[in-house]
Every structure is written in C-alpha cells, then in structure tokens.
From Swiss-Prot:
Belongs to the DSH family. Residues 92-254, 558-675 are annotated as: Disordered. Changing S254A: Reduces interaction with FOXK2. It comes from the Eukaryota. GO terms for molecular function: frizzled binding; identical protein binding; protein domain specific binding; protein kinase binding; protein-macromolecule adaptor activity; small GTPase binding. Changing S252A: Almost abolishes interaction with FOXK2. Changing S251A: No effect on interaction with FOXK2. CDD domains: DEP_dishevelled (cd04438), PDZ_Dishevelled-like (cd06717). The lineage of its organism: Eukaryota, Metazoa, Chordata, Craniata, Vertebrata. Plays a role in the signal transduction pathways mediated by multiple Wnt genes. Participates both in canonical and non-canonical Wnt signaling by binding to the cytoplasmic C-terminus of frizzled family members and transducing the Wnt signal to down-stream effectors. Promotes internalization and degradation of frizzled proteins upon Wnt signaling. GO terms for biological process: canonical Wnt signaling pathway; cochlea morphogenesis; convergent extension involved in neural plate elongation; heart development; heart looping; intracellular signal transduction; neural tube closure; non-canonical Wnt signaling pathway. It comes from Homo sapiens (Human). This is Segment polarity protein dishevelled homolog DVL-2.
Length: 736
C-alpha cells in the first residue's frame, strides 16, 4: 500500500508525497504540473511503476463523506481534497491472487451463508477509539452482535503477527477480494461483520495505514458501498493496528476512552402522544480533532425519556429516527434533533450506554453543588473520593484530615465521634466543609447572618453522626450543651437552645477542656417544659434598668493568667454574690415581670439548679458548696416557702472557680432585702457608676450610661427589643 499527498510547490509545480506498500518512510517527488490539472498519467510518468500497480485517491462522497477512490484512467484528473491530493499505491511486485469482481457483485452470493453471530457480553466489548461518536446504519439488525470479545492489546499483537502473511498471500493490487473463501484476518475479525456487509483482509490492508495523516482522517474506498457499521469497524480496527505509542496517544484525544464507554447500543422508541416534551438536555463534546459527539446531560421529570427509564445521563446519542450523527457537527446534530422533536409522531433514539449507567449511586452530591456534564468515570472516581457524608466511625486518617491545621491539643484528635468525645472535636467535625451541615448566609429581619445554620439541622447532624444518642431528644440536649459551652453562638447571645433559631460557630481555636469548665449537661437544655423561656445572656455594658435598687458590688476582674477571659455568663454569675436570692414565694408579688412560684434561678431559670443548697436562717451565712466545678448562674432560691427572712448571703456555687481566679470576691445585696424577680431584669442588673472603675468593666464593654439620661423614646425602643427577644421564633424566617 502507498499513499501520496500533493501540495502546491512553485508556480505550476506540484509536490507528490507517496508511501509505497507498507513502508513507513514517505517519498517526495515534484511534478511540473499545476495541482488543478494534474492527471494520473502525469503521476505515473514520474513514478514509472509497473503496469499492475493500483492507485487510490482520497475524495469526498456526498453519501459517505471521505472515501478512497480508485482511478485507472490516465487522463482523469486527480481529485483535490482540502487543497491536497492524497493517494494510496498498491504495488504488484508481490504475488497476487486471482482478481475478483467488485465488491457489490459477490455481496449477494456470499451474504446468505453468513449466519448472524450470537450476542456478546457488553462488558467484553471494545471501546470507541476515535474522536467522532460511534453510529450504526439502520440496516444493521443488532449492533452489539458485531463486537469482538478480546482486549485491545491482544488485537494489536495478533494483527502484527498476521501482517507478513497478509502481505505475502492475501493482498492484491486492486484492493479486491479473494474468491477462495475468507482469509485468516477475516476469520479473526469475523465478529465485526454482519450479513449485509463483507470486509476482507485485502481491502482492510488498503485502508490500514501507519501514517500520521491516516491517524488524523478516516479513509474508505468508494467501491465497497459500506454501511456505517463497517465504517465504524474499519476505524476501530485501524486504531488497534497502530503501534502502541500511537494507541496511547489516540486514547488521549477524547475523554470517552475504552475504559469509560462500551458499545452497548440500545434503541428506544418514545411515544410522544402521551407526553408534551422529550425531557432531555444534551451536551456537546469537542477537542482539537473536532466535535466528539452528543451526550445526554440531564433528564427532566415528566418527559418521555424519564418515563421510559432506559436512557440515563452520560449516554451518547448516536441516531435520532433515521438521522445518523456520525458525520455531523454538534451544531448540526442539535438542529436536527430540534427539528425532529417539533414534528409529530414517535421518536426513535439510538444511544450508546454509559460504562456505568448509574454513577449517582456511588455518592450523594451536596445540596448546593452544581452538576456539570463531565466524563462519567472521572465523575465517579473524583466525587467518590471527595464527596459524601461524614462516616460514623472515622479512622485516624480521616479524623486527622478534618482537624488538620487546627490548634486543638493532641488529646482532642484521633477520636471517634461519640457522646464521650469532647465537644470541641465534635464541633470541629461539624464545621468541616464536607460535614453535611448546611452552613450559609441567612436573612433575619433584613439582616444577613453570615455562615449561619439552623438549630434543627444541628440536632439532626448530631443524631446521625455522633454515636451514643438513644433518641433525638438526647441530641437536642447535646446541642444545648454546645451553645452553653460557647462552641456555637446565637446571634443575639440567647443562651436557651431553640431549633427554630440561627446559630454560628464560636471560637474553635481554644483547647478542648477550656470549653467545658463551666458546662453542666444537667442544665436546662430547652427540651423540658421551660423551653419557651427565652432568656438572654448579658450584653456588654448593659445600661441600668429603671426603678430598681442598686447595690454596692463590682464586676470581678479577669485573672491575669487565665488563658481566656471569662465568658459573659460566668461574669453574670457573680452579680449577686454567686447566687444568693431571697425567697420568691413570699416576695413574688413584688416582681414587675412574670411571677415565678417555683423558686426559679435568677438568670436562666434552670429547674435543675433550683434545688435548695443554701441554709436558711436569720443573719446566718451559708457554707460555700461546689457542684461539679460549675458556677451557679443567677440567684438560687432558698428552700423555705413560709416567707421567712432570706439568708444574708447565698451559697456560692462557684468555689472552685473562685480558687482558680483569686481576687474574684462576690458581693451580695444588703441583708434582709428581697429582690424583685424578673429573669431579664436580674440578668441586666447593673453596677452603679461611682464604684465601678473603667479597668474592671467587662471586656469590650461600651461606656456605661445611666438610662435616666436617655430620652423616653429610646427607652421604649429598648423595651421593644426585649419584647422581640422574648418571642424570637416568630421573627426567624428563612427567605433564602
């Protein structure tokens, strides 16, 4: 086999590059004839080949596209294709078998004995090697009967072994066919042949070239009247016959390679009378070698394709009705598909199934991640490695990935997520980008809260990702503990957990134990009957509340060696001497707010902290008591209900913390004076301006201003704010 290419040299000169037989090195000659007037006789006069040589030239056919045309008339002009003339020369130096008539004559004689082949498993089939999509002629009865169950490497080796025999005994000058039965290559490639087409080794040898130009374009002989299945077959065999480096290069031209796409062809007939639309989006693939086919991008619910169920995202669209997409550009294919859909009647879609028809079964996409049409295999492998829910028992490597670069102590890392894991590690895992918790900007009262999440989402995440919760209510208590520990924060410092409120992550840079110093899981978590009691942590520099008595005390100064300043709820626990309060049973009528008859706590109203620990007695001072190292928040009610005199100083439940912070001395109200109860007022009880120096104000507190100097309209605004905070769930509306 030989090939030649001519290009304009000088004026009136044509360069001829030809390949002789199977030689890899081309030859170059110059013919002093313009390219538009060069004839076969001019070509022969320069080459001076024997008379038995056959010449094939590349030309364009209206029905088949690029073909190889045999020219035997010396006066015939050589076809010009894209400004060049391409030719293949088959020499008659080798012994040639008896000449056979053209292909279309023996087709009728040889077709009946060829029985249809049994179907082969799709997973053993070969892949698509060219950048153009595969297609099959409508006359081919079953397209996946034409596939050969052998690997690509085996095919290359076997074809290379048979090349000398084919050159010695099976090739002839005209590219015709043997009359003594199929050659060994025919038997070797019989799986590709159907009863309506006949491909012999001799013709195959004329279309199998090792040149780079053949690597770029497919060439076929116009005398064979091949179907599109045979053209796909020829392209496929030519790819497998190439040398291994070229196989590797060819596989990189298209993202749809043998490992990602198999020739499992299905034909789906859709009855468009029952449905209003087809219901698919298509994606075109292109590369440096041209358009690479049309693929199913997504399937819409309610359409004809979704109702059928066999076509899935990632499938390659080969043919619609009788319109084949083999030699169409992507734009033409889209236009043809649009025209067919607008016409009445059923629609027949022929698609090549994806290597894995359901890649979405391997992973779950996050709710906000866009879906883009990509290679299905790369989609599966990449997403399976990077996407998915957080495992229930992550290994050490997974946990180290989540906490990588964090400032947590060594004791906080490498543990499984369970109820025994420290809360800081659980919160770090929950704050990871792929944890599954939906964290995004939220809108509340026309205010944007960045990186916020819903309380119910936190409870659900804890219940599904942290081991050890027998029921969801326990996960809710755990979430309340996260709020009290400062690992998650409410936007307005609300310390009672609610599933309808928005929260943000707190400071996760401290050590694990630093968050748990003041935490007690027995506190009111919002899941009991007091869940509707929305109490607020003290705001920095709270202004005085009107008409309340003032007492001589001061805020405790932060310890100079403390790793972090005490949180505001810890500061508020010293408001009345660490938790002393008068009995509310006898003095409840003096409350300006809602009256509590159960001896509630002064700040948070936790029922667990209402147990009487102070000793009642006139003028007696109770002994300090400790409760697990947690500070008493607000005032503790005395255990008496007979209206006896209140204790002069309540029990300070924060004795351990007082030892940890020397210099923090509680100061109580004057003995014998009952305090009017109101949860909000008790929390907001201010220090009088004279005895409070600026150095001992809470960190970050603004200048203290007496509310008496504030205009009445501003006072009403502050009261409205507290009323709104008393019913926060009515204002938290997610409008995103």
């Amino acid at each position: 086999m030989a090939g030649s290419s001519t290009g304009g040299g000088g004026v009136g000169e044509t360069k001829v590059i030809y390949h002789l037989d199977e030689e890899e090195t081309p030859y170059l000659v110059k013919i002093p004839v313009p390219a538009e007037r060069i004839t076969l006789g001019d070509f022969k006069s320069v080459l001076q080949r024997p008379a038995g040589a056959k010449y094939f030239f590349k030309s364009m056919d209206q029905d088949f596209g690029v073909v190889k045309e045999e020219i035997s008339d010396d006066n015939a002009r050589l076809p010009c294709f894209n400004g060049r003339v391409v030719s293949w020369l088959v020499s008659s130096d080798n012994p040639q078998p008896e000449m056979a008539p053209p292909v279309h004559e023996p087709r009728a004689e040889l077709a009946p004995p060829a029985p249809p082949l049994p179907p082969l498993p799709p997973e053993r089939t070969s892949g698509i090697g060219d950048s153009r999509p595969p297609s099959f002629h409508p006359n081919v009865s079953s397209s996946h009967e034409n596939l050969e169950p052998e690997t690509e490497t085996e095919s290359v080796v076997s074809l290379r072994r048979e090349r000398p025999r084919r050159r010695d005994s099976s090739e002839h000058g005209a590219g015709g066919h043997r009359t003594g039965g199929p050659s060994r290559l025919e038997r070797h490639l019989a799986g590709y042949e159907s009863s309506s087409t006949l491909m012999t080794s001799e013709l195959e040898s004329t279309s199998l070239g090792d040149s780079d130009e053949e690597d770029t374009m497919s060439r076929f002989s116009s005398s064979t009247e091949q179907s599109s299945a045979s053209r796909l077959l020829k392209r496929h065999r030519r790819r497998r016959k190439q040398r291994p480096p070229r196989l590797e290069r060819t596989s990189s031209f298209s993202s749809v390679t043998d490992s990602t796409m198999s020739l499992n062809i299905i034909t789906v007939t859709l009855n468009m009378e029952k449905y209003n639309f087809l219901g698919i989006s298509i994606v075109g693939q292109s590369n440096e070698r041209g358009d690479g086919g049309i693929y199913i991008g997504s399937i819409m619910k309610g359409g004809a394709v979704a109702a059928d169920g066999r076509i899935e995202p990632g499938d390659m669209l080969l043919q619609v009705n009788d319109m084949n997409f083999e030699n169409m550009s992507n734009d033409d294919a889209v236009r043809v598909l649009r025209d067919i859909v607008h016409k009445p009647g059923p629609i027949v879609l022929t698609v090549a199934k994806c290597w894995d028809p359901s890649p979405q079964a391997y992973f779950t996409l996050p709710r906000n991640e866009p879906i883009q049409p990509i290679d299905p295999a790369a989609w599966v492998s990449h997403s399976a490695a990077l996407t998915g829910t957080f495992p229930a028992y992550p290994g050490s490597s997974s946990m180290s990935t989540i906490t990588s670069g964090s400032s947590l102590p060594d004791g906080c890392e490498g543990r499984g997520l369970s109820v025994h894991t420290d809360m800081a590690s659980v919160t770090k895992a929950m704050a990871a980008p792929e944890s599954g918790l939906e964290v995004r900007d939220r809108m509340w009262l026309k205010i944007t809260i960045p990186n916020a999440f819903l309380g119910s989402d936190v409870v659900d995440w804890l219940y599904h990702h942290v081991e050890g919760f027998p029921e969801r209510r326990e996960a809710r208590k755990y979430a309340s503990g996260l709020l009290k520990a400062g690992l998650i924060r409410h936007t307005v410092n609300k310390i009672t957990f609610s599933e309808q409120c928005y929260y943000v992550f707190g400071d996760l840079s401290g050590g694990c134990e630093s968050y748990l110093v003041n935490l007690s899981l027995n506190d009111n978590d919002g899941s009991s009957g007091a869940s509707d009691q929305d109490t607020l942590a003290p705001l920095p520099g709270a202004t005085p509340w009107p008409l309340l008595p003032t007492f001589s005390y001061q805020y405790p100064a932060p310890h100079p060696y403390s790793p972090q300043p005490p949180p505001y709820h810890e500061l508020s626990s010293y408001t009345y001497g660490g938790g002393s309060a008068s009995s509310q049973h006898s003095e409840g009528s003096r409350s300006s707010g809602s009256t509590r008859s159960d001896g509630g706590a002064g700040r948070t109203g936790r029922p667990e902290e209402r147990a009487p620990e102070s000793k009642s007695g006139s003028g007696s001072e109770s002994e300090p008591s400790s409760r697990g190292g947690s500070l008493r928040r607000g005032g503790e009610a005395s255990g008496t209900s007979d209206g006896g005199p209140p204790p002069s100083r309540g029990s300070t439940g924060g004795a351990p913390n007082l030892r940890a912070h020397p210099g923090l001395h509680p100061y109580g109200p004057p003995p014998g004076m009952a305090l009017p109860y109101n949860p909000m007022m008790v929390v907001m009880m201010p220090p009088p301006p004279p005895p409070v120096p600026p150095a001992v104000q809470p960190p970050g507190a603004p200048p203290v201003r007496d509310l008496g100097s504030v205009p009445p309209e501003l006072t009403a605004s502050r009261q409205s704010f507290h009323m709104a905070m008393g019913n926060p769930s009515e204002f938290f509306v997610d409008v995103m």
